[in-house]
Structure formats: C-alpha cells, structure tokens
Amino acid sequence: MALTKPDVDVLVVGGGLGGLSTALFLARRGARVLLVERHASTSVLPKAAGQNPRTMELFRFGGVADEILATDDIRGAQGDFTIKVVERVGGRVLHSFAESFEELVGATEQCTPMPWALAPQDRVEPVLVAHAAKHGAEIRFATELTSFQAGDDGVTARLRDLGTGAESTVSARYLVAADGPRSAIRESLGITRHGHGTLAHFMGVIFEADLTAVVPPGSTGWYYLQHPDFTGTFGPTDRPNRHTFYVATTPERGERPEDYTPQRCTELIRLAVDAPGLVPDILDIQAWDMAAYIADRWREGPVLLVGDAAKVTPPTGGMGGNTAIGDGFDVAWKLAAVLRGEAGERLLDSYGAERSLVSRLVVDESLAIYAQRMAPHLLGSVPEERGTAQVVLGFRYRSTAVAAEDDDPEPTEDPRRPSGRPGFRAPHVWIEQDGTRRSTVELFGDCWVLLAAPEGGAWPGRPPAPPRIWASASTSISSAAMSPPPPAN
C-alpha cells in the first residue's frame, strides 16, 4: 500500500475523553486530524467526573482549562467534600477517607499551579470538541469505522455515515484507536491484554430527587455503601438534585440487567438514603462491569491505542478518564513531532513504554482503593496504596526517549520533594517571566524548553541554534531564566 499524500495526518476513532483530547492536542500542533465517533453526539451522561491537577495542567496547555473550571470548580461551586464508607447516606460511618476538600487536596496543592475540578464528562466533551474544531480538526459524529488496512506508509480506512448509510474511504499517516474497552481495532490487530480482569458487575442509575434532608446544600461527596442488603456507591452530579447510584449485581446467581426495573431501583435508592417515601425520577439505568486490564502492546505499526482501548481502570479514585487525557497529550506531541520531521518513527515506541508504566500505577492504585472501600476480601492480594499525589504528579517515565538514571528503580517520588531527575514531571516553582508570575510547569507543553540559571548569559530570551541532532528539523525552543530566591531575613 502506498500513501503518497494521505487525506489526513491522523484518523482518530472514538470521541470520548481520550480521543477528543488527542484530536485537540494534535490540532493545536498543526496536524490534519479527522475524528469519527459512532454515537450521534458527545456523552449525554455524566460518566467520568473530576479532573486532577495534572489533567488541569494539560488542559492549560490545550487552552481549555478556564472553561473547564468555569463549568465546575470544586473549590467555588461544590462547597465541602467528603469520601466515606457508610451503611447508608447520612447513616453510620464505617470509615472516612476525606472529611473536607482541604484534606482531599492538601497533598497536591503545593506541587502544582492548577486546582482540582469536578466537571462531569458530559460537560467536558463539548468543550474539547469546540476547541479541537477551532484549531482545524474535523469531527464527525454518527460515523463508524467499518474496516481498515495498515501498512508501512499509513492506514486506509472505510467509514460509514450511520445517518445516511453512505460509505467513504479515508487515508491517514496514523490511526489512533480510542474506541473504548472493547476496542474492535485492538482486537483486529490481535493485541492481547493482561490484568485482574472483571472485578464486579454493577447497575448504574441516574435519578433526580430532592435530598437536601440527607445531603445538606453546599456539601457534596462520594459514599461507598455497605448496606446489609447490597453494596454500591452514591454520588452527586453538577446539576441540582441529580444523583448517581451504583449497585453491585450477582449474575453468577442468575441476576440479569432486566431485573433492575425502575421500581426495583427506586426501592434500592430508598434504602441507600434511608428515605422510605422518596419518589425519585429515574432518568437512566445501565449495566456496567468494573475491570482492570492493560494492553500488552500500545502500538502496531501506524496504529496507536489511547484511553480505554489501551487500559481499563476501576473507577475508584477517579483516575480512568484523567489517564485517558494524559494518553492523548503524550501520543499527540509525539505524533506531531514525527509529522513535522523533528523526530523519527522510533519516538512513537516510547509512547507505549511510558504510558503503560503510568497505567500500571493508576490501575494498581485504583485496585488498592477498591479493596479498601468496597472489597476488603482483596486486601493483601492487590498492591498497597501509594497515594494520589505520587500517582498523579510523581510518576516517572522510562523509555528510549528519556536519558534516565538507573540508580533508582522506584516508579514514583513524592512531588512535594521533587528531584528534577529525567523522566519525572517538571517541578512546580513560581517564577517571574516578562513581569508575569507563572509556574515553571506552564513553560512546558507546546515546544522544547530550556531552563537556564542567571549565568546562562545570552540564552534567556534568545533561543540558541538547535543542537546538531535537530539541525534539519523546524524546532522551536522556549527558554527562561531561573533566579535564586531572595535570602531569608
């Protein structure tokens, strides 16, 4: 197959958080992007809610952070926050993991310029679509991939418009598979997965009801329910009086999704919030499986996996969607570097090496949290919890693209005491640049960065000629001078 002039640089299949983030970050770097999504629109359900500080740093690079914060800033809009294991909402507390927002974020506040946010997926996705399109990405909903052929020169794909039935062919240098946990693209390539597999089965219910007597106004939280009659979770959404309720099911005992009628779900919700007379408005009921998988390969020629297509993460800890966005950022800058001629194809191999390490940390952390809060029988058989700060901000990349030191095998560090060693995230330090106070973290994201001490001379403000290895590339370098803090009084 010879693709002399592909229709697009990158074809992204799947319009969830991972796919849309990939499209946005690629388009901002000038790549020609086409994203197709078989659903008719962005998510109509809250799904993954919450953005950790690393995700907000990436959203700052993508130019969408302010809109996400305006959509739902947990500090300003949500009031207090709690995470507890309870028999029922408002009932006996079996264990408390966070009594306040300050307790929840205290371990990360000094490590990052960005706050946590609690925007739900159905609010985030339209923002990503709008900004990706603004930068030139083409987004096609109600369009599915029916087949593709991959070769050394790229990909040829067949697409079907689900509204009209019309089929078309598109050629691309690269294909990003963001088509979810049951990824047809991954399976067609014969890419296997490893992990704990299916952990539990749930029915997810979205409903509306006035629960101010149970959850006071100005307070929000996530409750893990250990009711005598069932196990589940209860949580808020960003809309007044709208809530989520998940109840564990037992298909091995013959239970079926259709057994969970609106009437039965109403009875369970009444038990969960201890309100026998409550009449909730049931908006949606869906079956859902909790699982933990990681793909054995993240790249096959011109095809790269992103998000749930590459790994499936238990939702405990709220890191699955955040990790998908991180995948999108990492694969996008590497694809853009190759497309621009700044790097060779081997750079793409580092994507899977780096992101699979992060995914292992995230899956292990999520499993540890799941065992603590919902499945104590798993304690001792899953890794111990490292802590959100280390997993979110203290992870380390190891790959052929990182000139890493091999003197420390640990995959994380405490971001409150950053080492600055290769492979770790850039430490957060407040600096003054052109009269503006900003974080060192904000210097990264769009181009190569050189940090120079005051004795760096002519470097700050006048980027040097690229080293010889980049001589043939159109490479942009940002530089900044670092001054020591003033002496203490």
Swiss-Prot record:
Q: Name one Pfam family in it.
A: FAD_binding_3
**Which UniProt keywords are present, listed alphabetically?**
Antibiotic biosynthesis, FAD, Flavoprotein, NAD, NADP, Nucleotide-binding, Oxidoreductase
The positions annotated for binding FAD are: 17-18, 37, 121, 145, 308
Please tell me which top-level EC class this enzyme sits in: oxidoreductase
What does the record give as its pathway?
A: Antibiotic biosynthesis; daunorubicin biosynthesis; Antibiotic biosynthesis; carminomycin biosynthesis; Antibiotic biosynthesis; rhodomycin biosynthesis
Q: Which cofactor does it need?
A: FAD
Its GO biological process annotations read: antibiotic biosynthetic process
Spell out the Gene3D superfamilies in the cross-references: 3.40.30.120, D-Amino Acid Oxidase, subunit A, domain 2 (3.30.9.10), FAD/NAD(P)-binding domain (3.50.50.60)
Annotated catalysed reactions: aklavinone + NADPH + O2 + H(+) = epsilon-rhodomycinone + NADP(+) + H2O
Where along the chain is composition biased (Low complexity)?
468-482
Q: What is its EC number?
A: 1.14.13.180
- Gene Ontology molecular-function annotations: FAD binding; oxidoreductase activity, acting on paired donors, with incorporation or reduction of molecular oxygen, NAD(P)H as one donor, and incorporation of one atom of oxygen
Q: Which residues form the active site?
A: 224 (proton acceptor)
Q: Which residues does the record give as aklavinone binding sites?
A: 317
Q: Where is this region: Disordered?
A: 402-428, 455-489
Concerning InterPro entries, the annotation shows: FAD-bd, FAD/NAD-bd_sf, RIFMO-like
Task: List the SUPFAM superfamilies hit by this protein, alphabetically.
Answer: FAD/NAD(P)-binding domain
Family listed: Belongs to the PheA/TfdB FAD monooxygenase family.
**NCBIfam families to which the protein is assigned, alphabetical:** AkvoneHdxseDnrF, AkvoneHdxseRdmE
Q: What is said about its interaction partners and assembly?
A: Monomer.
Role noted for this protein: Involved in the biosynthesis of the anthracyclines carminomycin, rhodomycin and daunorubicin (daunomycin) which are aromatic polyketide antibiotics that exhibit high cytotoxicity and are widely applied in the chemotherapy of a variety of cancers. It can also hydroxylate 11-deoxycarminomycinone and can use both NAD or NADP.
From the Swiss-Prot or TrEMBL record, give the protein name.
Answer: Aklavinone 12-hydroxylase DnrF
Q: Which gene encodes it?
A: dnrF
